Amino acid sequence: MERFRIIDLPKIVDPRGNLTVAEQMKNIPFGIARVYWTYDVPSGERRGGHAHRTCEEIVIAVSGSFDVTVDDGRGHKEVYHLNHPYQGLYIGTGVWRTLEDFSSGAVCLVLASELFDEDEYIYEYDEFLEWAASPSPSQGGSV
């Protein structure tokens, strides 16, 4: 089971402007419980810096670009450069993520499988590594 990967969303090209659609349980592999976005990120700042115990997410650069580093805590780490509004990065449960190198005017849209719950976040990297090293039925995700 892939813990993170690029998902191509449909891109409908039209001379009046392009359109991309995200539909839960169709091209988004989970039910969408929460949508949020970050914008006006100052140069050099980072976002993220945490993992989710139970929440899955799709991260989309709806405008501009930024890099997302994902880490499964078991030696598999990748950096994705997001710059297309018709592509999303699926991040399953139990994956540490850091977002950085935001371009001017970048907007990061996130589709989440769960409502906000402070208790399901892991904010300390060392705690994340310990958690990732122990087998857990909540690790994985829909993809």
Q: What are the roles of these predicted feature ranges?
A:
Residues 1-87, 104-107, 111, 116-138, ...:
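Non-catalytic, conserved peripheral segments adjacent to functional cores
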Residues 84-89, 93-101:
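Well-ordered alpha/beta subsegment
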